[in-house]
C-alpha cells in the first residue's frame, strides 16, 4: 500500500529572521516582481488542514512580469510531488481562469465537510479527468484524479458527487528559490 500523507499544522520551515517574506514593500513593485504569499499550506500528499487563509506578506521572484494580480505564492508541504516540488518549497501559481487543466500541476481545494469559518483544504497535484458526452454533445466529468509525481503516493480520486465541493484554485508556474 502506498503512503497517504496527513499534514499537521506546522510553523514556517524557514526561520522568521531569515524569512523571504517581506512586509514593507514598494507599491510599484507589487504584482511585478513581488507577489502575495498566503498562509495556506498546500499538501503534497492528501488534502491539507482546514486552516483559515490570510496573506503573510510579499515575496520577490527572480524575474519581472507585467503587472499581474492573478499570481500568488503558497508553501508546499510533503513529498508526493517530488522530484519537481519539495517539502517547504514556495510555489508561484496563477489563479485558474478556465480552460483545460489536463496534465497540469494545479492547486486544488476540496471543501468537503468543513467549518464555514475555514477556507477548505488544499493539495498540489497533476490534474487528470475523464469526460463523458451525452447525445446532445454536453459533457460531464466521469472521474477526476489528482496524481502525485512521487510513485510512493497514491492518487486522489474525486467522486462526481463531491465535484461541487472541489475546485481548481490555480495553475502551477514554478518554484521560487529562496536565498
PLM-predicted stretches and their roles:
Residues 64-179:
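Acidic/glycine-rich C-terminal interaction modules and beta/coil loop segments
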Amino acid at each position: 500500500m502506498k503512503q497517504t500523507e496527513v499534514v499537521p499544522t506546522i510553523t514556517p520551515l524557514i526561520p522568521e529572521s531569515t524569512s523571504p517574506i517581506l512586509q514593507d514593500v514598494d507599491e510599484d513593485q507589487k504584482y511585478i516582481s513581488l507577489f502575495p504569499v498566503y498562509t495556506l499550506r498546500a499538501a503534497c500528499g492528501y488534502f491539507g488542514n482546514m486552516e483559515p487563509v490570510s496573506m503573510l506578506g510579499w515575496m520577490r521572484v527572480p524575474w519581472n512580469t507585467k503587472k499581474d494580480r492573478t499570481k500568488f505564492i503558497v508553501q508546499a508541504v510533503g513529498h508526493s510531488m517530488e522530484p519537481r516540488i519539495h517539502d517547504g518549497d514556495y510555489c508561484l501559481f496563477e489563479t485558474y481562469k478556465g480552460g483545460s487543466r489536463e496534465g497540469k500541476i494545479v492547486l486544488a481545494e476540496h471543501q468537503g465537510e468543513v467549518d464555514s469559518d475555514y477556507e477548505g483544504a488544499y493539495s498540489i497535484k497533476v490534474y487528470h479527468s475523464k469526460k463523458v458526452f451525452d447525445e446532445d454533445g454536453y459533457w460531464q466529468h466521469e472521474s477526476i484524479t489528482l496524481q502525485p509525481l512521487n510513485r510512493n503516493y497514491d492518487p486522489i480520486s474525486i467522486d462526481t458527487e463531491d465535484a461541487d465541493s472541489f475546485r481548481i484554485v490555480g495553475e502551477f508556474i514554478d518554484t521560487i528559490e529562496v536565498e
